[in-house]
Amino acid sequence: MNSKLKKILYPHQLECLNASLKEKRGIFILPTGSGKTYIQIAIGLDDILKKKDNNESGIYVVNVPRILLSYQILKEFFEMTNKFEVPCDYLIVHSGTSIDEDGLLNLHNENLPWRDIRVTTSTEEIKEEVEFSKKNKRPLIVIQTYHSAHLTKSVLNELNLPIDVKLNDECQYMVSEEFSNQIDDKSAIKQFHFTATAKNANVIGMNQKDKWGEKLYVMTPREAIDRGIIVPPRMIVSTSLEDFSEEDLRKSFSKIVYQDWINLKKLNNKVSNKLLIKTRGTDDMSNFIKSKEAKELIQQGVHIFVIGSNKRVDNWYNGEVYRRPEWLELLKSCGADDSKEVICLHFDILSEGIDVPGFGGVSFFNSPELDKFVQNYGRSARLHKQDRENLKKGLITTDNREDWVKPYSYVIVHEYNDINKSQSNTIYEMIENLREYGFVPERDITIEQVRGISENEEMEDLLDDDSKKVVKGKLIDDWLIKYELESEKTASLSNDRFDTTDEVVIEYFNELFGDEK
């Protein structure tokens, strides 16, 4: 293992790198926010540095589910190889737009030659890049979507060249009929899979060790919380003073987002807040963009980001539409700026490993499946940079969060009276399991119902039924916090308007999360 690389990794990342040196196949399961991307980079870079010492080079492939994620992985890999002064060639294989060269030039080591980075789906161009790198004995790092991976594979098969290290990010997407042929790639000398949410299934599920290899490293969300790698969730259940239906909620969506924002600011007043909104689909986002609430928030200085594959939404920021890589850079820049307030609305695309710092809360408008809940929660579970430094210095601890800048990830849910409060109950159960049992997020699926995603495919829209797009119902007033689960072991009740059923639930919460004797 490279000694310089060893010094910059956190202990759990170093454990993962050590595990990869002992095996040629395997799965790494770590919660969102724990730095899986840097583990992947470390595995690839360690092999690159070893070959460099022997005047050799190799081919390194990183597979991702989305075009947007590929640009982020490229930037982080590029930054690390330039810090280590390793001249590498890069190739992006998917149908997306060109890269942001200005952003990469800011990271470029002047002692290394600059070479333009192609974004292509042409096998001829892929072949040219592979042959150039081999001729000049330079490592080639290919970052591609699962949807386009077959193009690179066909070129390497034609040239009879192996992949030295293959890294499958968000590998749960390989558990599909479309991408299953990529699981056990015999042309890869080493192949490792990374996920926060394992998927089990017959024949090709991640429980099939003969195809995926052993689980080389598993960290539960609870363990990550206890080790100070991510912050714990704090659940906020909101409701109105009167009963309302889903139609009322749909009509009042923008108003409720505005109130979620106000509530988060009241609860989390140590920082400039950043809230991620998990919507039900395009209609929610499109209606919000046009709403007076969005205009008011922008006038107040809040940075509003909305993203979707549908042209009605696109990559929207404060009234303007941007190219996706530029939109992501703007979001990351605002996310990293402690002085800026941010609200970001999405349906699914930000769930898949997009690393945006700063989110302190996430608001759900539907009950996601377990893996989607963990991914969205993970977007807001990253440590504040000041807390990370204070933990290193021993100034704060994980068992006393009073002095933390960001002690929790605030998870906001909304009770739907006409469907028996199923959303808040479902998410509460997920949080309970995460806190109490340190579960490994896995989901069993029936493979006949699962196919791969296209790199540009519009995800399922919960409002795609035309009959559901008619905005009916009444506007909801007097939105309030009903109760909040304050920490792993205590429940704080912030309102006394409860009926008999609620009192039973509250009693159960107090029994479950009451102080330990």
Which functions belong to the PLM regions below?
Residues 214-286:
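Conserved interdomain linker/interface between the two RecA-like ATPase lobes of SF2 helicase motors
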Residues 311-441:
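Conserved RecA-like P-loop NTPase helicase motor core
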Residues 23-44:
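Walker A/P-loop
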Residues 172-233:
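Post-DEXD/H (motif II) to motif III coupling segment of the RecA-like Helicase ATP-binding lobe
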Residues 1-29:
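Conserved pre-motif I regulatory segment
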Residues 224-231, 386-491, 495-499:
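A conserved SF2-helicase RecA2
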Residues 123-162, 177, 181:
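Conserved helix/coil segment N-terminal to the catalytic DExD/H
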Residues 39, 56-81, 85, 89-98, ...:
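Conserved Walker A/P-loop ATP-binding site and its immediately adjacent core
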